[in-house]
């Protein structure tokens, strides 16, 4: 993580100046080489543990995505961030108005150098009213909201909190997908490759509400494969599936048809233990 951040910080200044530098070229080559060696070494050591392999691959890639994407430059991210900020104030009402640290401005930062210059602490914040908070269910913003709240308690600057929330969303995605890969008895490689879709990583490394929703859908498919291969379905399995259905229903019910695959395990319901 430290290597990723250091490399991105240096490259940000080079990119903003748009001047060729042999040092920058060498850094890019070395940075890329380290990544390749790291991936090869981890793959050789842990190719039988696809779930852990996913975690170790996704962490540096996800963090790179997270810092390369400037704040609010992911589609609709400003509305998602404002909703998460509202949740961090322990306000779960569906309203559009939220007071945010005055350092915040929609697409305010125009360069990567500005991002790193805005990291730090702010012990005397002032607040400005914004009116673009999304109206999605509070459940999808709970994890980044908690991270934002923790950042405010520690008096971190607005954009330090911003990236802390992004990191929390990324951690949620990595955790859920890793568990999904772990429990599925088959198609582990398919899950692994699918979750490295660049558009999916972009959502996971931002405030997008689709991050937790898609993660829940991936878990739902993996859990179906787990139950389909299981001899007897237990009561706890029914509770987990019902919880996933309720979550999807409350957050984005258009994804509910995905649970139609569970008709494939209905015969096993006669053997609930």
Where are these regions (language model features)?
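Short acidic/glycine- and proline-prone juxtamembrane loop motifs at membrane-interface regions
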Residues: 206-213
């Amino acid at each position: 993580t430290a290597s990723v951040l250091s490399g991105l910080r240096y490259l940000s200044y080079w990119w903003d100046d748009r001047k060729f530098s042999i040092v920058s070229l060498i850094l890019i080559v070395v940075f890329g080489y380290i990544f390749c060696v790291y991936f090869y070494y981890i793959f050789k050591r842990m190719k039988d543990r696809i779930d852990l392999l996913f975690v170790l691959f996704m962490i540096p890639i996800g963090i790179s995505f997270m810092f390369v994407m400037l704040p609010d430059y992911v589609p609709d991210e400003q509305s998602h961030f404002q909703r998460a900020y509202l949740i961090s104030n322990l306000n779960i009402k569906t309203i559009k108005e939220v007071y945010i640290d005055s350092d915040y401005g929609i697409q305010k930062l125009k360069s990567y150098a500005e991002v790193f210059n805005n990291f730090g602490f702010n012990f005397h914040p002032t607040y400005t009213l914004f009116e673009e908070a999304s109206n999605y269910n509070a459940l999808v913003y709970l994890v980044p909201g908690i991270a934002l709240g923790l950042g405010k308690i520690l008096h971190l600057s607005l954009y330090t909190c911003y990236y802390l929330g992004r990191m929390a969303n990324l951690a949620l995605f990595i955790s859920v997908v890793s568990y999904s890969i772990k429990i599925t008895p088959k198609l582990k490689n398919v899950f692994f490759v699918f979750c490295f879709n660049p558009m999916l990583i972009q959502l996971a490394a931002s405030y997008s509400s689709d991050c937790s929703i898609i993660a829940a859908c991936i878990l739902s498919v993996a859990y179906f494969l787990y139950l389909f291969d299981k001899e007897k379905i237990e009561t706890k399995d029914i509770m987990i599936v019902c919880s996933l259905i309720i979550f999807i229903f409350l957050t984005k019910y258009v994804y509910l048809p995905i649970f139609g695959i569970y008709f494939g395990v209905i015969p096993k319901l006669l053997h609930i233990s």
